[in-house]
Amino acid sequence: MNYTLLNDFSQIDSNEWNTLLKESIQDTPFLRYEYQKTWWEHKGGGEWKDAKLLLITAHENNQLIGIAPLFIAEYENEPAILLNGSIEISDYLDVIVKKDDHAKFISGLLDFLASSFGDTWSKLDWYNLPDDSPTLLALKEEANKRGWMHREEVYRPTPRIALNGSFEDYLSRIEKKQRHEIRRKMRRAAESELNVKFNLIGQDADIEKEINTFFELMIQDPNKAEFLHPAMREQMTSVLHEAYKNNYLWLGFLEIDGVKTAASLNFDYQNKLWGYNSGVSQAHRDLSPGWVLLAHTIQWCCDNNRYEFDFMRGDEDYKYRFGGVNRFVMRSQIKK
């Protein structure tokens, strides 16, 4: 394999990137070209101040074999190489390479990083690797082979709901008390005189207006309001516009008495829904708008044959009450 360092995302074709991603070990919204490029332009909404892009490609017989979207920055008082998208807003990260090429790609990548940038970094620190990623074992084996220190730990749970039938099938598989609670809240909302409606934003929407409405609901939560500082809002707005343009943004609202009262922001990608964020107004709390909207979201998944709802990172109680089962993302470190 021939490895090349690129200085900018403009040096690689977006279609070539996304085509390889479709056959890669992981195909997630966070690894698509437009997401990775947008994340880098905003440095994670200001998460990283001083960072240098290390966008590395590998070719074999003039064919693109692998992509390692990386950057180098001072982290925990050491110069570290991280996956582009680290850490806070990209739930799943990895290298982009087919399974059959993966082991030799990782081995060659570490050789390239050691020979080309050996004096500029002291560790690899890769967050948000899915727990079934072959990259985890490959990094461990390569570190052992080189006599480097290796450490791996669980970083965050990522609860998921497996879906393979109707909404009633889904309800029948969750705990009885929660099943009754979901049904009761949905029925109460449906019978309300306030005309409760679930609406999904279409491709003809005024997307800027809808995104701003979502943000207005999101910041009703004080913690989310603190998170959504101006640089992060700019970052997320750009990401959502790209997802909308590429037809995988899923934005649903619950309207009560003609007013959008709860919002569910997801990525509809690879036949599953990836639950990215949400927002709920303080109005009409008696109708449980957040719960009712989540139930409608899962019902939409069932009606449209999505095989999974992925809550992504976080161990909030409601995820398990709706039937989420833990998977995890990992942190893998290598020190020379």
Regions found by a protein language model. Name each.
Residues N2-L82, S86, N128-R285:
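A conserved beta-strand-loop-helix scaffold within acyl/acetyltransferase catalytic domains
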Residues P157, Q203, D315-E316, Q333:
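Conserved beta-strand edge residues that scaffold enzyme active sites
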